[in-house]
From Swiss-Prot:
<comment type="subunit">
    <text>Interacts with PAP1, REF2 and PBP1.</text>
</comment>
<keyword id="KW-0597">Phosphoprotein</keyword>
<feature type="compositionally biased region" description="Polar residues">
    <location>
        <begin position="628"/>
        <end position="641"/>
    </location>
</feature>
<keyword id="KW-0507">mRNA processing</keyword>
<feature type="compositionally biased region" description="Low complexity">
    <location>
        <begin position="272"/>
        <end position="286"/>
    </location>
</feature>
<feature type="compositionally biased region" description="Polar residues">
    <location>
        <begin position="685"/>
        <end position="700"/>
    </location>
</feature>
<feature type="region of interest" description="Disordered">
    <location>
        <begin position="712"/>
        <end position="742"/>
    </location>
</feature>
<feature type="modified residue" description="Phosphoserine">
    <location>
        <position position="81"/>
    </location>
</feature>
<dbReference type="GO" id="GO:0006397">
    <property type="term" value="P:mRNA processing"/>
</dbReference>
<feature type="compositionally biased region" description="Basic residues">
    <location>
        <begin position="476"/>
        <end position="485"/>
    </location>
</feature>
<feature type="compositionally biased region" description="Low complexity">
    <location>
        <begin position="659"/>
        <end position="684"/>
    </location>
</feature>
<feature type="region of interest" description="Disordered">
    <location>
        <begin position="628"/>
        <end position="700"/>
    </location>
</feature>
<feature type="compositionally biased region" description="Polar residues">
    <location>
        <begin position="856"/>
        <end position="866"/>
    </location>
</feature>
<feature type="region of interest" description="Disordered">
    <location>
        <begin position="49"/>
        <end position="85"/>
    </location>
</feature>
<feature type="region of interest" description="Disordered">
    <location>
        <begin position="466"/>
        <end position="551"/>
    </location>
</feature>
<feature type="region of interest" description="Disordered">
    <location>
        <begin position="419"/>
        <end position="446"/>
    </location>
</feature>
<feature type="region of interest" description="Disordered">
    <location>
        <begin position="826"/>
        <end position="845"/>
    </location>
</feature>
Amino acid sequence: MSLPVTPVKSKVCSTLSIQHEMDHDQCRDVLCPRENLLAINRTNNIESVAIPRQRSSKNKKPHEHTQSQVRFSIPDPNEISQDSPLKIVFPKSGNETERRMSTSSLLMNSHGHLVDMHSKILVDVPKEVWKFHHNRRKKCESRHRKTRSDVRSNTSSSGKEPNHSRSKSLQSIIVDTMNTYRATEVETSINENTSNISQVSPLNLSFDRPPPLTPEKNLYLTPESPLNRYHLPVPLEISLPPYLSPQNKDKKRSSLVYDGDGYSQFQEGNTSSSTESSLEQPSSSYSDEDDSIPYAHHDVSFELNNADADKLLGIDENANVNLKIQRRNLKNPQHIKSKTDRECEEKNTEKNVSLKILSTPNKLIDIPDLEHMKSPPSTGLNGTLKFFQQFEPSEEPTSPTRQVNPESLDKLDMSFKFPSSTTNNNVDKVHENRNSGDTNNEDFLKVDTSPVNQSFESRRQMLIDLQKSPTNNNPRIHKHRRSRSVHNIDDISLNFEATSTPPAPTSAPSIPVEHSNPCTSIEIPKRSPLRFTSSPKTSDIPPEAQSPKNGSFLQEISVPSIQIIPDESISHTREPSPSLIECPEDENEAFSTEVADHSIAIISETKSVPSIEPFKPLSSFNSFGQEIQNKEPTPLNQTPTDLIGKQRNCVNPHSIPFSVLSSNSQSSQSGSSKSSYNSEFSSNTAITDTTSQPSVTINRSTLEHNFIEEKRSIKNLGHGPPSQKNNYSFPRNKNTPSNRHDLDFNTIYEKRDGKMVEVILLDEDEDVGLKNNDISRTRVCHAQKAKNEQQKKRLSHCNEILGMCDKTADDAKRIIYQLVNEKHKFSEKGQQTKPKKSRVLPPLPFPLYDEKGNSLIPNKYQSSIHNDIPSHRKLK
């Protein structure tokens, strides 16, 4: 069985094909598998189309490939030129591989290198072309291979013929092959009488001539060719686009030919010898004739000293170049600037210089004296100084205080201190030093240091004296203490000078309260006279029981008003209580249970003002949606001393934009501040007395109701409405029977200030919790469920207590700010006097209870205060 081979060439190329058939070497005997496969694809459906080549059996070797189709065979060691994927390649040593590869180019034939991609047919290289390349290659292999740099040095030094270059020889092979096939195509096109078309083949195969080349020049270098280093089909020639310039539009551009590494122009007029002489020229260089658009050369010059060089070149601040602006500016001639423009530029530069001087950190600017100038003033037209020549100094006397010490200029005064230290505590000397001061010192600004208000100045001086005195242990020194929101309970037992009156001037001597005469000064009671009782039970008392004299006194007396910064356009003040009782005969009696049920409110100066509405506190822990509802209190037969530290009621803070103190800081102050243990806020009103020690009001029905509601809300935690979860109170009473296991929070009793106080535990130890909750845990069926419930309850109680602490701190701060902003007004005929501009300090706190724990009745001081009002007016 014989395989079809490449068709026989036509008579036109007989000079090439016949000689090639007769003188072919041994490598030609073995067909290229690529060629056989291509021929099989073209003639698989044709019978007896291809004529097999005649081969002599004398030169056949036993291991040479036969015409039969064999899929696998052992290759001949001498046959290395055949490169096919069907061959079995055995591993060999490195030296043997290099030796075989070096001889492969010598044994390589002219087949299997070129292919027409349009017709998918292999194209043979003409023998003359291949023979020339083969001979030159032998000569190169016989001599030592030199590098390109050695070749360049040899050509420059001597006139030796350079070695054969592969790139140019490959280009010559490609160009000669394409020219040969173009010539044969032209000759066949002239001979139209001879039919070279096979009558049998439906594929239009011609056996008398090589396949015609397509006008698209689809000749490619096969991937299997050893000349192809990329192992991909590489086009042999690339056609460049035509010239774009009108001068060269009729000129044809020379194409680029593959040279083994890239594409370069092939010199068509050069012969092989001339080609070899021009081997060392760079292969990828292009001549100037290939430029379709010639370079535009413009001689443009501009001054680099020009300040607006960037503007002239069209370069903006972001380094963007505007070529249109650049071209317009460079083409237009630069106009000579006029004289006026130069003058304007000089003025601008002078201004810039002055601004630079002013921007320096130096404090002194030396202005030269025109009389002592070394250079005479210019008398030209520009910048004449005739006006300054006639200048005479003014006759106004200079101020004697302006005495510049030449030695102190440009030097740092190390002895300068600000403010001047005053070691003397005497007020007169301090004022004297302030008024006199360093009059001769130029560094001080001369301003009027007299105070706007004498009372304000005296108050400020008193605070300075208190601050300076080292032996003064007064706890009310006005220092800023972040941790103290209210005064300690120790401040209550101290005696102070003022109650609700502004501080007296420093010129008036302050008389101690213990040794003061009641005729000359007001007797300071232990309870503030501004605190009156307001009880709903007063409606039952007949109007005759109320003293008209006392009522007039209440209208005349100036009571501090509550100043609140509203969030909305609503004035937040309290209505005056209509029922005010004064019983002078009960001076030495204790509080009645009806009066003790209600907190004491500060009466407002206005007669009829809308009431204060509750608001949502800006707390970081809780924001209550509904206001706390408290039922009408009922009397409780119990002394307030037994209830101190036991009642924890919620307070509705009012609309004051004060920052709420954090609960962590509040809880951390419990050890240092005694008032955190003993102060309790009222549930009826958010306004407490001026002593920051709120009153205590408890009634039995409220306690029982709150206690029941609290237990229900805690048991149904997370299931009830918001009112049950948010509205809470912790009433604790000794007389109220309650078991420890009924309470949902853990408390311990501690002795503080000689009293047993029950303290709520937020985070307790495990052993204490086990002891306190032994009874409650017995009711729980599952231990894990009890643990989860207890954790939830602790978390809820912690949030509740922290919210109460926030509210307490907010209320205390609000009261302090209210007391600071109070304005006391006293008028004889009920006429309101103008308020003073000076800031009035808050009234000083007073104790609620005496040393024995009995509450103080404010009514027992009413008569004495009422009698001392005229004397107080005389003092003012």
